[in-house]
Amino acid sequence: MLETDNQTPLKLDFLLLEKIARLLAPTQMVELVLVSGEKMREINRNLRNCDYATDVLSFPLEAIPHTPLGSVVINMSLAQTNALKLGHSLENEIALLFIHGMLHLLGYDHEKDQGEQRQKESELIKTFNLPLSLIERVQD
């Protein structure tokens, strides 16, 4: 189940994201928060001590029964910029970022694993007929 908190003026259809959430976490609730670039920088600075606006952050919650899996926070300003730059829709860019964030909530870590997140992300991109994600675009 997907719970959304759109803190931007943009109106979006969340149907694809709901399908992704149901596939990856069929019994758990996931929170999706859409924020401005300025808000993302503030979150990143306050919670990770990194003073810049990143594209997506994931905050898993403890594995306690009947609690949400966690939150995925997406920088809508950067998502819009990247969608235009890469020539695909904003909805597709958000879906790519959501998949990336969801995999982090599920314990994947592309900085430490042996390509497992990259492989799972590729499978999901094909399943949902999405363009290449950042993790795939920078692949060697």
Curated annotation (Swiss-Prot):
Give the matching InterPro entries: MetalPrtase_cat_dom_sf_prd (IPR023091), YbeY (IPR002036), YbeY_CS (IPR020549)
Write down the required cofactor(s).
Answer: Zn(2+)
Per the entry, the cofactor note is: Binds 1 zinc ion.
Q: Which Pfam families match?
A: YbeY
Main localisation: cytoplasm
Q: Write out the GO cellular component annotations.
A: cytoplasm
Cite a single GO MF annotation: RNA endonuclease activity
PANTHER family referenced in this protein's UniProt entry, alphabetically: ENDORIBONUCLEASE YBEY, CHLOROPLASTIC
What is this protein's function per UniProt?
Single strand-specific metallo-endoribonuclease involved in late-stage 70S ribosome quality control and in maturation of the 3' terminus of the 16S rRNA.
Q: What is this protein called?
A: Endoribonuclease YbeY
Q: State the organism named in the record.
A: Helicobacter acinonychis (strain Sheeba)
Gene giving rise to this polypeptide: ybeY
